[in-house]
Every structure is written in structure tokens, then in C-alpha cells.
Curated annotation (Swiss-Prot):
PANTHER family: PENTATRICOPEPTIDE REPEAT-CONTAINING PROTEIN. It comes from Arabidopsis thaliana. PPR repeats lie at residues 76-110, 111-136, 137-171, 172-198, 199-229, 230-264, 265-291, 298-334, 338-364, 367-397, 399-429, 430-464, 465-495, 502-532, 533-567, 568-598, 604-634. It is found in: Mitochondrion. One of its GO terms (biological process) is mitochondria-nucleus signaling pathway. Residues 719-749 are annotated as: Type E(+) motif. One of its GO terms (cellular component) is mitochondrion. Residues 639-718 are annotated as: Type E motif. Its main location: mitochondrion. This is Pentatricopeptide repeat-containing protein At1g32415, mitochondrial.
Length: 761
């Protein structure tokens, strides 16, 4: 009995909860199919009107409208207008248009609602037709102004603005914002200056525009001129400073903010993360959570935190897992409307070495960008097999990013043939793909093939990237192939309009000419450079130093300091090398001291070896040995190898034999089969006439199996480098190649009997 009673009560409550829906169905009958689909977001009567409008039942729709009672003080036309706007915003524009036609009454607000619906749905022909026929106010004109700006028709927008019979601050702001959005900052500034009155929105629009169009200095000036700032203003400036890398100033401004919202916090957290200050990003997030007026993170906050956790690497992988757990437990994944949060989590796991977790996320929701992230991580770990397996899933899509990643992976592994095979199969290759292939050929020392591929790239109608040229110039410099370097320089001049003064490219040209022995050409390019960075100065100083032009190198170093550029460790390596090759001991010691004390640059092992070389070349072997004894670290084989080599140069020094033997003993303790060390000691003994010791050392080399790597030389003929090893029987072939180039065939016949001397490296 009790069970029956409970059942009846439950049935009653169920019926009661459905009374409204049932009564509607009884009144209109069950002839309306898919009634439920029209209920989403609408009341019963709104859904029924929408259905009738959709079916063309205008009489029924009008009947329903007339039956709607006046709701309190709300006029019926206001309600109808609100309903029309609601239909238009939710995608039922045709139904909204029919409603507009059947409405018993309309006013200008109704017309503006319909006009806005047309514009938002990009039905511009209908929008213009209505605009021409309807009564207009400032809102109507502003709606059409927005439409023109959204279409990128800035000039038409300005013309329409000039025709407006009346304007308000919203109209002015709409035009300013539209011009900025279309990249016309100059015109936007003119309109901004002409505004009769400005509000904070006007100022914020200009500040944001300057920040996004490389005008941070102008944004700073406007920010300083503003009498009234709001949270948007402050947040824009924080974002701007972070965007341009001045995180310290961004944080100072953030701390001064009178109020903050989630966007402000996120701007600063993101700024830390994108500038690789990952710990600071996480610490600021914790501070945000402790704030009295704590705010919930949004999607951008979580994305930045995920990248910060990934940036901290393997050691902080647990932190990333905790973040993911928080995302799930707090339901934050529901804010990931565009999938960017999921991608950032994949990146986080991949960067932290938890590739299985990244792969698991990918399997839950496959995404091409996430797939590329994991492929890159597999390749970085040298796991070609897993990268290939994942690549097979996206191979048919011919996505350039994934294909280029695999090409790069094969090249890194030295598998040039597979890389080139994939390169040839990829349709619609872009400049990045070509550059990766060319760079890989250079990396695998296939310099002629790399230069040939550049020619193919140009023939295909693609303009090489500056990075492409830089790679090839680097290869020309590495092989001292001046002809190839000049050829690339000519291609640059032909393919780059008005010779784009790219700093990296100019630096590469300076370096290439210097390494190829054309120091005057290098200096000519350097002297014409409008902008010079530290790399520019370093390339030229190193070039002069390697050519034995110590005075010019040191004078250029002084010019660099006078220009306000700060030297770095590479700069000092160049000037110390210059001093070493010219025997300028006092100057070298002064520079070494200034490096540490004046510029607070910690010397590296190369700097210490330069100082050893400086002392040794000046014949001060004992001082060089004492210098090594005072080093702030335990010397390795390169240090003792340098000293041993200097003993070979100074074998006449009375201390040479003892120093050489001590250096060799330490060197061979560290590296028992070090070939250069054995050979250097043999040379010292030979110079001193100690042939018995030399013979003993060579015998020891034989027992240990120590073999000196033969020196090599090369000559470029018809664009191809021909390499010859020391002691190679093909030396006569080298003679046949080189002599016609320098002497001509007739001279070759005359000099046929004379031996050919080649430079070895």
C-alpha cells in the first residue's frame, strides 16, 4: 500500500513538472515535428513562434504574437524586438527576417536589430538594402561602419563616416578600431587626434594598436598622457612590455596596478612563460590563487601554465601532472573551446619526457598540431622508429610541418637518401622545407649538393629565405670556397629587391668572406652596414685576427667600445687571438684582466688556451706552464695538448724538453691514445736531435695502435670539392687539376717534371 502511494506521488510530481509542455502540445496538437530541437535556449512560446516562422506559418505566427500579453511595463514592440534579436544571434536569421515582416509594429530599434543580424551573418546585400530604406540614427550608421571595417574596406569606411549626419564617441571609436584592425595606424592616429572628445576606450584602442604594430614607444607616450586609466589600459601595457621582452618593466607595472582581473594576471603569467621565465610564471599563479579576491583561471592562463611546466623539463614533470589533475578535477577542460589547452598539455608532456602521456592525450582527441609536437619530440630523442609510426597516420595529409620534421629527422640521423626521397615526394614545398633540406646537406658535408639544390629552388620560382642563404654562406666559409660564396652573394643580389639589409644575412656575408681569405671584401660589407650588432663586430674582429692583422683588429675593438656595444666572450677570443699571433703579451694580459674585472665575463677554456698560446708563441714556455698550474679548474687534454704543441714550436728553448715531457705525461694520463700528443712529443725530440727518444715514442705508438689522422687538402674544380689525404697516391691527380687553373696548359708542359706543393690542413 505504501509502495503504491509513493508511486502515485512520484507520478503526480512527474506530471506536474511536465504540465507546461503537455498543455502546449495539447493546444497545438502533435503535428509539430522536432518540437524539442526548437526548445533549446527559448521559452515554450518563443520556440513555437520560431517553428511557425520556419514552416512559413505566418498567420499562426502573427496569431501567437498577438496573444502574447504585455509583460509588466515592457511594451510589446520591445519584446518583439528582443525576440527578433535573439533569433538572429542564435543563427535563425531567416526566421528573424520573417518575424520582422509580420510584426504589427516596428520602431528604429527593431530596424537596427535586423540590420545588426544581417551584418553579423555577413548578408551584406540585404543589410545595405535595409539600410537605404529604413529610418536611421547614429546606431544604424555605426553598424554599417563596423561592417565595412570588418570587410577590410577602410577607405569606404572613412567615406561613410564623413557622410554621417551625427556621430558619437562610439562611432569615432568604431572607425579608429577598424582602421587599427586593418593595419592603418597612421590614419587611425589622424582620426584619434581629430576626435572632439575621447573616452578610455579610445585611448585603449590606440595603445593596443601601437603594441600590436611594433609601436611600443608610441604606446608608452599615450599611456603617460592618459589622465584616466582602467584595468584594460594597464593590462595592455603589461602585455606590450612582455611582448617586446621587457619582462622586468612589465612586472613593475603589474605590481603598480590599482586593480587586477583574470586577464591582467594571465597577461603577466603568459609574459613570464613566453619569455622562458617558467618558474616565475608558476610562482605568480600561486600568488594569484592566494589573493584575497582570488579569480578562477581562464583558458589562456592554463595554456601558459602548461607551457611553463613543459619548459621546466624532465625534473618538474610531476608539476605538469598535478596541473593536468587540477584541470580535470576543476572541470577547466570545459573552457577549452578551440582545443588549444589540449595541445598545450600534449606539448607539456612531450617536453617533460612523458611521451606516453602525450600520446595518450593524442589518442583521446587526434589533432594534427599535437601529432607534430610528438613527432618532433620522438625525433629529438633519436627515436626514428616511433616518429615514423606516428608520421604514417598523417602522411596522406601532406602537412608540410610533419613532412619537414621527418626530413629534418632523417638528416640529423645522417640518412640523406631517405630525407631526399621524402623531400621529392612532398607536394607544394615551401621555403622552410627547402631550407631544412639544404641545411641538412651542409650538415652532412654535401656542400656541392646543397649549392645545387639552391639553384633548383630558384628555378622553381621560390625566393630563398635569408636563413637559406646564411646556411650556404656558412658552408662556403667552412670549406674556404670563395667562388661558391660569391655565387651565393650574386643570387642574393638578384633575388632580393633593393638588397634587403637583413642583419643576420650581412653578418653571414662578412664571416664568409673573412673565412675565405677575402678580408677586404668582408670589411667593405661591414663598413656599409647601417646596423651592427655584437655578432657583426665579432665576425670582423675574428677575421682580421685570423689574417694576422692584429693592429686593425684591436682598433676595431676600440671602435666597437666607442659605439656603445658591449663585448662578449667571443669578442675577447678574437682580440686575444690577435695579440697571440702578433706577440702582444702586455696588451693580451691587459685584455684578459679587463675581461674579468671590467666586463664581468667569466673566461672559458678557449680564452685560457689563447693566453697559453700567447705566452708560448712569445717563447715564454715556463710562464705558460705556470699559468696552467694556476688555472681555477683541472686542465683537460686540450690544455696540455696546446702546451705540448708550443714546445714543438720552441724546441730550442732550454726548458722545452722538460716542459714537453711533463705536459705529455699529464696528457697521456688523461688520453692514452691521443695521437696529436704523441706526434708533438716526437717533433720535440726530433728538433732536439734526440732520435733515440723519438724512435722509442713511435714504437710506443705502434704498440698502442695510435694512428695520426692524415691531413687533408681540397681543391674546387668545376664547382666540386676534390679532397686529397696526406700520403695519398693520387697527389699527382691533384697536380693535374691545380696546375692548369693557376698556370695554364702550356706552363704545365714546361713544369711537368717539378713536384707540386699543396697546402694541408
Amino acid at each position: 500500500m505504501r509502495a503504491l502511494c509513493v508511486k502515485k506521488v512520484c507520478g503526480f510530481l512527474s506530471k506536474l513538472s511536465l504540465r507546461s509542455s503537455i498543455s502546449c502540445r495539447r493546444y497545438y496538437g502533435d503535428k509539430i515535428p522536432n518540437y524539442g530541437s526548437y526548445r533549446r535556449g527559448f521559452s515554450n512560446e518563443e520556440a513555437l513562434i520560431l517553428r511557425r516562422l520556419s514552416e512559413g506559418g505566418l498567420v499562426h505566427a502573427r496569431h501567437l504574437l498577438d496573444k502574447i500579453p504585455q509583460r509588466g511595463s515592457i511594451n510589446r514592440v520591445v519584446y518583439w524586438t528582443s525576440l527578433l534579436s535573439k533569433y538572429a544571434k542564435t543563427g535563425y536569421l531567416d526566421e528573424a527576417r520573417v518575424l520582422f515582416e509580420v510584426m504589427p509594429e516596428r520602431n528604429i530599434v527593431t530596424c537596427n536589430a535586423m540590420l545588426t543580424g544581417y551584418v553579423k551573418c555577413r548578408r551584406m546585400n540585404e543589410a545595405w538594402t535595409l539600410f537605404r530604406e529604413m529610418p536611421k540614427n547614429v546606431v544604424s550608421w555605426t553598424v554599417m561602419l563596423t561592417a565595412l571595417c570588418d570587410d577590410g574596406r577602410s577607405e569606404d569606411a572613412v567615406e561613410l563616416f564623413d557622410e554621417m549626419p551625427e556621430r558619437n564617441v562610439v562611432s569615432w571609436n568604431t572607425l579608429v578600431t577598424g582602421l587599427i584592425r586593418n593595419g592603418d595606424m597612421e590614419k587611425a592616429k589622424q582620426v584619434f587626434d581629430a576626435m572632439p572628445s575621447r573616452d578610455v576606450v579610445s585611448w585603449n584602442a590606440m595603445i593596443k594598436g601601437y603594441i600590436e604594430n611594433d609601436g611600443m614607444e608610441e604606446a608608452k607616450l599615450l599611456f603617460g598622457d592618459m589622465s584616466e586609466k582602467n584595468v584594460v589600459t594597464w593590462t595592455s601595457m603589461v602585455y606590450g612590455y612582455c611582448r617586446y621582452g621587457d619582462v622586468r618593466e612589465a612586472y613593475r607595472l603589474f605590481c603598480e596596478m590599482p586593480e587586477r582581473n583574470i586577464v591582467s594576471w594571465t597577461a603577466m603569467i603568459s609574459g613570464f612563460a613566453w619569455n622562458e621565465l617558467y618558474r616565475e610564471a608558476l610562482m605568480l599563479f600561486l600568488e594569484m590563487k592566494k589573493d584575497v579576491d582570488a579569480v578562477s583561471p581562464n583558458g589562456e592562463t592554463l595554456i601558459s601554465l602548461a607551457y611553463a611546466c613543459g619548459g621546466l623539463g624532465v625534473e618538474f614533470r610531476r608539476l605538469g601532472e598535478q596541473l593536468h589533475a587540477q584541470v580535470i578535477s576543476n572541470g577547466w577542460e570545459t573552457v577549452d573551446h578551440d582545443g588549444r589547452l589540449a595541445k598545450s598539455l600534449v606539448h607539456m608532456y612531450a617536453s617533460s619526457g612523458l611521451i606516453a602521456s602525450a600520446q595518450s592525450l593524442l589518442n583521446e582527441s587526434f589533432d594534427l598540431q599535437s601529432c607534430n609536437i610528438i613527432i618532433n619530440r620522438y625525433l629529438k630523442n633519436g627515436d626514428l622508429e616511433r616518429a615514423e609510426t606516428l608520421f604514417e597516420r598523417v602522411k596522406s595529409l601532406h602537412d608540410k610541418v610533419s613532412w619537414t620534421s621527418m626530413i629534418d629527422g632523417y638528416l640529423e640521423a645522417g640518412d640523406v637518401s631517405r630525407a631526399f626521397g621524402l623531400f621529392q615526394k612532398l607536394h607544394d614545398k615551401d621555403g622552410v622545407t627547402w631550407t631544412v633540406m639544404i641545411s641538412g646537406l651542409v650538415q652532412n658535408e654535401l656542400f656541392a649538393e646543397a649549392a645545387s639544390l639552391l639553384s633548383d629552388m630558384v628555378r622553381c620560382g621560390l625566393k630563398p629565405l635569408n636563413s637559406t642563404y646564411s646556411v650556404l654562406l656558412s658552408s662556403a666559409g667552412a670549406t674556404s670556397n670563395l667562388d661558391q660564396g660569391k655565387h651565393i652573394h650574386c643570387v642574393i643580389a638578384k633575388t632580393t629587391a633593393c638588397y634587403d639589409p637583413d642583419l643576420i644575412l650581412q653578418n653571414s656575408l662578412v664571416s664568409m668572406y673573412a673565412k675565405c681569405g677575402a678580408i677586404e671584401d668582408a670589411y667593405e660589407i661591414f663598413a656599409k652596414m647601417v646596423q651592427k650588432d655584437t655578432v657583426s663586430w665579432n665576425s670582423m674582429i675574428m677575421g682580421l685576427s685570423h689574417h694576422g692583422l692584429a693592429d686593425k683588429a684591436l682598433n676595431l675593438f676600440k671602435e666597437m667600445l666607442d659605439s656603445g656595444k658591449k663585448p662578449n666572450s667571443v669578442t675577447f677570443l678574437g682580440v686575444l687571438s690577435a695579440c697571440s699571433h702578433s706577440g702582444l703579451i702586455t696588451r693580451g694580459l691587459e685584455l684578459f684582466k679587463a675581461m674579468k674585472e671590467t666586463y664581468s665575463i667569466q673566461p672559458g677554456i678557449d680564452h685560457y688556451i689563447s693566453m697559453i698560446d700567447l705566452l708560448g708563441r712569445a717563447g715564454k714556455l715556463k710562464e705558460a706552464e705556470e699559468f696552467i698550474s694556476a688555472l681555477p679548474f683541472t686542465p683537460d687534454h686540450t690544455v696540455y695538448g696546446a702546451l705540448l704543441g708550443l714546445c714543438g714550436l720552441n724546441w730550442r728553448d732550454k726548458d722545452a724538453e722538460g716542459i714537453a715531457e711533463r705536459a705529455a705525461m699529464r696528457l697521456l694520463e688523461l688520453d692514452p691514445v691521443n695521437a696529436p700528443g704523441h706526434v708533438a712529443l716526437c717533433n720535440v725530440y726530433a728538433g732536439l736531435g734526440r732520435h733515440d727518444m723519438e724512435k722509442e715514442m713511435r714504437k710506443e705508438m705502434g704498440i698502442k695502435g695510435v694512428k695520426k689522422t692524415p691531413g687533408c687538402s681540397w681543391v674546387v674544380v668545376n664547382g666540386r670539392a676534390n679532397v686529397f689525404l696526406s700520403g695519398d697516391k693520387s697527389a699527382s691527380e691533384a697536380a693535374q687539376m691545380v696546375l692548369p687553373i693557376f698556370c695554364g696548359n702550356e706552363m704545365l708542359e714546361e713544369e711537368e717534371e717539378k713536384p707540386l706543393s699543396l697546402c694541408h690542413c
